[in-house]
Amino acid sequence: MCIEDPFERTPRILLSSDNHQRVSPLRNALLRAGFTVDLASDYRHLELLWHELRHDVVLFEVSHAGSVELATQSAIRIKRQDAKQFVAYLADASLQAVGLIGDAIFSRDAQRLPQALRKVLAEQL
C-alpha cells in the first residue's frame, strides 16, 4: 500500500472571483509558485467544478461587500458536503470581519499569497 506524501505534489486550487480583473494576477502568482490552478467563471461555476474535480483548496476572491453572501453560501454548501474541504477567501481587511465562513482568509497580495497558502496548508497536516 502506497501512502502519498502531502509534500510530494502541489495542492490543486480551484479559484473564483467576483472581479475578473483581479483574479488573473492572483492565478498567475500561484501558477509561477508551482500550484495547479483551475479558474471558475463565478461562484456557482466553482461549485460545479468542485463537484467534478474535488480540488485540495477552494479559494474565493471577494472584492465587493455585495458578493460576501454569495461566496459564503457557496462555501457553506461545499463544507456541508465535505467538512474536511479546505475553503479560503482572498479579501481586503475591510471584508474580513463581515462573516466569511471557511478555514482561512488571505490578503490579495499576489506576491505573498503562495507562501501564505503553503504555510497554512503545512499547519493543517
Where on the chain are the PLM-derived regions?
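Non-catalytic signal-transmission and effector/linker regions of two-component phosphorelay proteins
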Residues: 1-22, 27-29, 80, 95, ...
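Conserved beta-strand segments of the P-loop GTPase G domain that flank and frequently precede/overlap
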Residues: 14-16, 58-62, 87-91, 107
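Short loop/helix-cap segments at secondary-structure boundaries that form the rim of catalytic
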Residues: 27, 50-52, 93-102
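Short hydrophobic/Thr-rich beta-strand motif most characteristic of the beta2 strand and flanking loop
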Residues: 34-42
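Short acidic-hydrophobic, aromatic-tinged amphipathic segments that line or gate anion-handling sites
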Residues: 40, 104-109
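Acidic, metal-coordinating helix/loop segments flanking the phosphotransfer/catalytic sites
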Residues: 41-57
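Conserved phosphotransfer microenvironments
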Residues: 59-82
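A short, hydrophobic beta-strand element within the central beta-sheet of small alpha/beta folds
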Residues: 78-97
